[in-house]
UniProtKB/Swiss-Prot annotation:
Its main location: nucleus. Sumoylated by SUMO1 at Lys-289 during the hepatic acute phase response, leading to promote interaction with GPS2 and prevent N-Cor corepressor complex dissociation. This is Nuclear receptor subfamily 5 group A member 2. GO terms for molecular function: chromatin binding; DNA binding; DNA-binding transcription activator activity, RNA polymerase II-specific; DNA-binding transcription factor activity; double-stranded DNA binding; nuclear receptor activity; phospholipid binding; RNA polymerase II cis-regulatory region sequence-specific DNA binding. Orphan nuclear receptor that binds DNA as a monomer to the 5'-TCAAGGCCA-3' sequence and controls expression of target genes: regulates key biological processes, such as early embryonic development, cholesterol and bile acid synthesis pathways, as well as liver and pancreas morphogenesis. Ligand-binding causes conformational change which causes recruitment of coactivators, promoting target gene activation. GO terms for biological process: acinar cell differentiation; bile acid metabolic process; calcineurin-mediated signaling; cartilage development; cellular response to leukemia inhibitory factor; cholesterol homeostasis; chromatin remodeling; embryonic cleavage. A zinc finger (NR C4-type) spans 107-127, 143-162. The keyword Transmembrane helix does not apply. It comes from Rattus norvegicus (Rat).
Length: 560
């Protein structure tokens, strides 16, 4: 199969979709003019609704670029591939984060430079004094206009009525002003100030860090046996006795190329674009609430049952950045994906003789292949991605398809896995020891690396909001070359990074390093995906994986 035919099929797939994937059922930030000028060029490629002034805080972090030295396998289609005896995972380095020094806070009332915490939040000296005098002297103002006068640094004294109203609206607290006209506020607000200050310091400390360094990883893949001699115990139960009544559409047809589409193509429900989305400076100019939640009371918990959307609303909406809420809307209907894959496996088994069962590796490949179809459909229907031209979409997906598969598998284990088992996309728990005892050393090494990463992410309390952020960071990689709309890709990456940083600091304040630790997992995911690609190619050239599946199409497209 030529690279050109693969590319042509993939283009058609991205344009028209697949009939096999069912549609889901019904589903004023102050800024500096100088800073606006600084970022205007970088935002030139963004659609109009995304061309909002991006303050320094929205560009705090850029995804660390990973330098890899892929140790690929030199083979042709006709060769019987031999895995090197020792295939070394290359070292990974992470570059420093870029950082804008302009972190100056602005008064939420008038936009002047803040001087400290006054009566509930950060304000300037002028508004602090005005608010104090108004409350202590019990002044009553009137507005000669329509009670909506503009309040800024140049005309904050023109209408005291609207100025005081704005003080209240942004969160300045009447009860914080002392009635005895003595200096100082009420002591009960001290803990709030300390907590808010600590959050800001954590945020700045993460940004000012010299960068995160990933220690060199070295995992050796031993020589592989020539074939898979045993089956995994219990895994065939995934293709037996599966109910079909709830499956809306037939599964993917493997009698033809997975890229060929029918005239009736799938249409995804539109998700509203982020018209009201404000770039992320989540902490600055935010009113300090009188009560703060326990550090983990609003944190997402492990979700029971098989649906990534379970527990999605456990956190207060105010603690989840708007962008992350929009990313969550793009998530696929997991029960539907599960049902479709199970139906496909049953159909595959029914098409075979009763004595002829799928091999364990073949069954896993078909699960991964169908999962990859759902991942591509997720990308095609996602915000930002659907605004790219097909050529850019192809380049991004061809770059990261294996990483998205690995990340999907790992999150499934974090959210739904049980001790000593592997949780499959079909909803089946398979005994881990049975897999280890019945598969090749190289496959076991891959599985072991993935399980180690699962343990680390569980210890970090990895949740669904962070999962969707990592998915977008993997998909919108600025490492991809020759993109026509690189500005959009880079802009999405930076905005998702900023939203993820705000989310982790708001919801996990005691885990001060969580944001950095999550980013450190990305090169580890890439390392595992590289090994998985090499292993898949090895199995393919030895005839263990057929040509007519999406996994191999993507593998050849990436290596072309």
């Amino acid at each position: 199969m030529s690279a050109s035919s693969i590319t042509g099929d993939f283009q058609d797939f991205l344009k028209h979709g697949l009939p096999a994937i069912a549609p889901a059922p019904g589903s004023e930030t102050p800024h500096s003019p100088k800073l606006e000028e600084k970022h205007r060029e970088k935002r030139a490629g963004l659609p109009d609704r995304h061309r909002r002034p991006i303050p320094a805080r929205s560009r705090l972090v850029m995804l660390p670029k990973v330098e890899t030295e892929a140790s690929g396998l030199v083979r042709s289609h006709g060769e019987q591939g031999q895995m090197p005896e020792n295939m070394q995972v290359s070292q990974f380095k992470m570059v420093n984060y870029s950082y804008d020094e302009d972190l100056e806070e602005l008064c939420p009332v008038c936009g002047d430079k803040v001087s400290g915490y006054h009566y509930g939040l950060l304000t300037c000296e002028s508004c602090k004094g005005f608010f104090k005098r108004t409350v202590q002297n019990q002044k009553r103002y009137t507005c000669i206009e329509n009670q909506n006068c503009q309040i800024d640094k140049t005309q904050r004294k023109r209408c005291p009525y609207c100025r005081f109203k704005k003080c209240i609206d942004v969160g300045m607290k009447l009860e914080a002003v002392r009635a005895d006209r003595m200096r100082g506020g009420r002591n009960k607000f001290g803990p709030m100030y300390k907590r808010d200050r600590a959050l800001k310091q954590q945020k700045k400390a993460l940004i000012r860090a010299n960068g995160l360094k990933l220690e060199a990883m070295s995992q050796v893949i031993q020589a592989m046996p020539s074939d898979l001699t045993s089956a995994i115990q219990n895994i065939h139960s995934a293709s037996k006795g599966l109910p079909l009544s709830h499956v809306a559409l037939p599964p993917t047809d493997y009698d033809r190329s997975p890229f060929v589409t029918s005239p009736i193509s799938m249409t995804m429900p539109p998700h509203g674009s982020l018209h009201g989305y404000q770039p992320y400076g989540h902490f600055p100019n935010r009113a300090i609430k009188s009560e703060y939640p326990d550090p983990y009371s609003s944190s997402p918990e492990s979700m029971m049952g098989y649906s990534y959307m379970d527990g999605y609303q456990t956190s207060s909406p105010a603690s989840i950045p708007h962008l992350i809420l929009e990313l969550l809307k793009c998530e696929p209907d997991e029960p539907q994906v599960q049902a479709k894959i199970m139906a496909y496996l049953q159909q595959e088994q029914n098409n075979r003789n009763r004595q002829e069962k799928l091999s364990a590796f073949g069954l896993l490949c078909k699960m991964a292949d169908q999962t990859l179809f759902s991942i591509v459909e997720w990308a095609r229907s996602s915000i930002f991605f659907r605004e790219l031209k097909v050529d850019d979409q192809m380049k991004l997906l061809q770059n990261c398809w294996s990483e998205l598969l690995i990340l999907d598998h790992i999150y499934r284990q974090v959210a739904h896995g049980k001790e000593g088992t592997i949780f499959l996309v079909t909803g089946e728990h398979v005994d881990y020891s049975s897999i280890i005892s019945n598969t090749e050393v190289a496959f076991n090494n891959l599985l072991s690396l993935a399980q180690e990463l699962v343990v680390r992410l569980r210890s970090l309390q990895f949740d669904q909001r962070e999962f969707v952020c990592l998915k977008f960071l993997v998909l919108f990689s600025s490492d991809v070359k020759n993109l026509e709309n690189f500005q959009l890709v880079e802009g999405v990456q930076e905005q998702v990074n900023a939203a993820l940083l705000d989310y982790t600091l708001c919801n996990y304040p005691q885990q001060t390093e969580k944001f950095g630790q999550l980013l450190l997992r990305l090169p580890e995911i890439r390392a595992i995906s590289k090994q998985a690609e090499d292993y898949l190619y090895y199995k393919h050239v030895n005839g263990d994986v057929p040509y007519n599946n999406l996994l191999i199409e993507m593998l050849h497209a990436k290596r072309a």
